């Protein structure tokens, strides 16, 4: 229905915004392409040229067998597997308890910004904090490797309350 679709769209938008504004590096992994990009689960999970120490499964009702297989292997080898919201109840769109069993062995959090950022705290590459220690929520960054150099670009991502008044903010930038 339209209401279900709207809810799913909102959750997708929310998790994307929480990760970006929470200074967490991430990529979306396409479940249909996963078998061709990741032959088996490992820790870190190797998908194409990328490697992942943490995987977030955001409130999925169904997962493919091939995805569950790789996630189980990743988790069994010590990878950080985080489920947000409810456990998957379907495997290949058929009722199954395989997703629930994996869910129960993993980090389980509610669909909430603070819990997500807290669960991923140890996986940060760059941390942006205000002088008072709070995480920023109005900056984004990009860290690039270019030959033997690394470049860090930080930018505001929100419109200021009043464009005519400049408000400076002291930031603490932590790499690694």
Q: What residue ranges belong to the model's regions?
A:
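Carbohydrate-binding surfaces of carbohydrate-active enzymes
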Residues: 1-176
């Amino acid at each position: 229905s339209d209401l279900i679709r709207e809810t799913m769209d909102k959750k997708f938008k929310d998790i994307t915004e929480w990760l970006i504004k929470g200074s967490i590096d991430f990529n979306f992994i396409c479940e249909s392409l996963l078998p061709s990009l990741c032959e088996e689960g490992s820790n870190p999970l190797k998908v194409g040229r990328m490697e992942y120490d943490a995987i977030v499964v955001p409130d999925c009702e169904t997962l493919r067998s091939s995805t569950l297989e790789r996630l189980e292997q990743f988790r069994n080898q010590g990878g950080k597997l985080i489920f947000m919201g409810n456990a998957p109840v379907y495997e290949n769109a058929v009722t199954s308890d395989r997703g629930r069993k994996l869910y129960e062995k993993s980090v389980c959090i509610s669909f909430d910004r603070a819990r997500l950022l807290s669960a991923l705290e140890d996986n940060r590459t760059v941390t942006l904090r205000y002088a008072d220690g709070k995480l920023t929520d109005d900056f984004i960054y990009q860290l690039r490797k270019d030959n033997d150099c690394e470049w860090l670009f930080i930018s505001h991502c929100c419109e200021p309350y009043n464009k005519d008044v400049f408000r400076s903010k002291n930031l603490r930038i932590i790499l690694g």
